[in-house]
Structure formats: structure tokens, C-alpha cells
UniProtKB/Swiss-Prot annotation:
Keywords, ordered alphabetically: Ribonucleoprotein, Ribosomal protein, RNA-binding, rRNA-binding
InterPro entries: Ribosomal_Su5_D2-typ_SF, Ribosomal_uS5, Ribosomal_uS5_bac-type, Ribosomal_uS5_C, Ribosomal_uS5_N, Ribosomal_uS5_N_CS, Ribsml_uS5_D2-typ_fold_subgr
Gene: rpsE
Protein task: With S4 and S12 plays an important role in translational accuracy. Located at the back of the 30S subunit body where it stabilizes the conformation of the head with respect to the body.
Domain S5 DRBM: 16-79
HAMAP family for this protein: Ribosomal_uS5_B
Keyword Ribonucleoprotein: yes
Domain comment (free text): The N-terminal domain interacts with the head of the 30S subunit; the C-terminal domain interacts with the body and contacts protein S4. The interaction surface between S4 and S5 is involved in control of translational fidelity.
GO BP field: translation
Family membership: Belongs to the universal ribosomal protein uS5 family.
Subunit note: Part of the 30S ribosomal subunit. Contacts proteins S4 and S8.
Any one of the GO CC terms: small ribosomal subunit
Organism: Chlorobium limicola (strain DSM 245 / NBRC 103803 / 6330)
Protein name: Small ribosomal subunit protein uS5
Length: 172
């Protein structure tokens, strides 16, 4: 799994909560029958702008979830949130999964399905419109949503990148 660069974020200092997105049972056929294993994709976040995801694999469900949580804590990113929503529209793609996220006015609520909803809830986004296109594989949908949130930048970051003031950015 590709690691996300988490610069200057210490998961130990955050009050991270976890949300299980999907459990998958796998089977290995051996001489004596089938041996089952499990993998779990888990989203962790503090509901205040930090979110990460992790994949855990084990022979027991609880062990897979625990491994997923530990992996998720290693992949935490900062999400820019403006008035409870995202700063701008974004389309992110991972594999065959595509996620469209649009900012929404306060009071709209979190309009998202399954895996994307879990990511946005853990990030602390309250008002957003989303549409999941292409593949509905929860693993790829979560990764596409995280990729989209990671690609966002707030107005201050854009101004710094362009070496302009905040006022100049909004006038252009």
C-alpha cells in the first residue's frame, strides 16, 4: 500500500476515533479444507480536520481491525475545512474508482455514500455533496476520497505558492 506523507502530524497527540468501512473474508484452499483469513479497511480521524486510512490483514476479524487502526494512524493527513465544508470542488481517481466532492452551504449535511461518508465524517466535514463514480470497491473508493482531500489547498496556501496576498488571489 502506498504511504501518504504525513508531515508534522503526530497521531499520538490527536484524539483519533476509528470507523470500520469494510471487512473481507478470504479463503485459502489447503489439503484439509479451507483456511479463512480476513482483511479490514479502517478510517481513523479526530473529526477536526485530520483523517487517515489503514488496511489490516489477519486470521481473526478483531486482529485485522486492530492492524488496520494502527496502519491508519501512520497515514494521517490534514484536511482544510472552511465553515464545515471543503474549500473547492475536487475529482479524485484511484484505480477505477472516481470520487467527486463539492462544497455545500451550511445545513446541507453530508451527502455521501458508504466509504466516502466514513472518510468525510472522520475528517470533520459537515456539509458536502459527493458522488462516487466507476468502481464501488471500498478499498479504492476510500483511497480516492483520501487522495481528493489531500489534493485540496486553502486560500492561504494558494497565496503563499503564488507569492501574492490573500486579497490578490481572490481578485484574480
Amino acid at each position: 500500500m502506498a504511504k501518504i506523507s504525513a508531515k508534522n502530524i503526530r497521531p499520538g497527540e490527536l484524539n483519533l476515533k476509528e470507523k470500520l468501512v469494510h471487512i473481507n473474508r478470504t479463503a485459502k484452499v489447503v489439503k484439509g479444507g479451507k483456511r479463512f483469513g480476513f482483511n479490514a479497511i479502517v478510517v481513523v480521524g479526530d473529526r477536526e480536520g485530520h483523517v487517515g486510512y489503514g488496511l489490516g490483514k489477519a486470521n481473526e476479524v478483531q486482529d485485522a481491525i486492530a492492524k488496520g487502526v494502527e496502519d491508519g494512524k501512520k497515514n494521517v493527513i490534514k484536511v482544510p475545512i472552511v465553515k464545515g465544508t471543503i474549500p473547492h470542488q475536487v475529482i479524485a481517481k484511484y484505480g477505477s474508482a472516481k470520487v467527486l466532492m463539492k462544497p455545500a452551504t451550511p445545513g446541507t449535511g453530508l451527502i455521501a455514500g458508504g466509504a466516502v461518508r466514513a472518510v468525510l465524517e472522520m475528517a470533520g466535514v459537515h456539509d458536502v455533496l459527493t458522488k462516487s463514480l466507476g468502481s464501488s470497491n471500498p478499498h479504492n473508493v476510500v483511497k480516492a476520497a483520501i487522495k481528493g482531500l489531500q489534493s485540496m489547498s486553502d486560500a492561504l496556501e494558494v497565496a503563499e505558492r503564488r507569492s501574492k496576498s490573500l486579497k490578490e488571489v481572490f481578485e484574480s
